[in-house]
Amino acid sequence: PKFASREGCWQGKAGMSNVVLSKQTVEDGEILTDKTKDLNGNASVLDPTACEIIVRMFMPKNGVRVYNPFGGGVQMGFVAGGCGYEYLSSEIRQNQCDANNALCQEYPNVKWLKSDTSKFTPKQKYDLIFSCPPYYKVEKYIDYDGKSPEGELNSLDTYEKFRDMLFQGYKNAISVMNDNTFFVVMTG
């Protein structure tokens, strides 16, 4: 794989992504790097090497489009774009969409769209569906205003509501799959 997990835009820059694992400050003219793992609120980080392996193994030979119903970080979109594929991601937070779209601007066919996945169905058919969905009440996802957007799965008050919205997002994604393609759900 050409995408290493320790280098690349997924390391974040100036807090632009939820995958920031280090923070740099300047004190007395010296750059100090803090690499503790809690700088991003202990958000999980999707491994770009795993993304590349998934795209290369599960994309059909003539496939061109990847859809991610629970967008999150930049990794899968950046890797898909780098491999020459179109990529669309549904993401409920505008700040995450803006950060990821800025990081992937060199790939014109890679886009994060602000939408509630449980209510959104893409207009095109897709050759690979990939999801690394949120876990119930494990992480807190916030937008520019410091609040979780309405419909953000981790902010729902019951597991049943979380499950139902998650599964509706999956159903919407399944409805736009081309025949003989894969839906990959990555957990853990």
Locations of regions flagged by a protein language model:
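Short glycine-dipeptide loop
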Residues: 62-63, 170-172, 177-183
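Mobile active-site "lid"/loop adjacent to the S-adenosyl-L-methionine
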Residues: 125-169
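Conserved S-adenosyl-L-methionine
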Residues: 48-120, 128, 173
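S-adenosyl-L-methionine
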Residues: 1-60
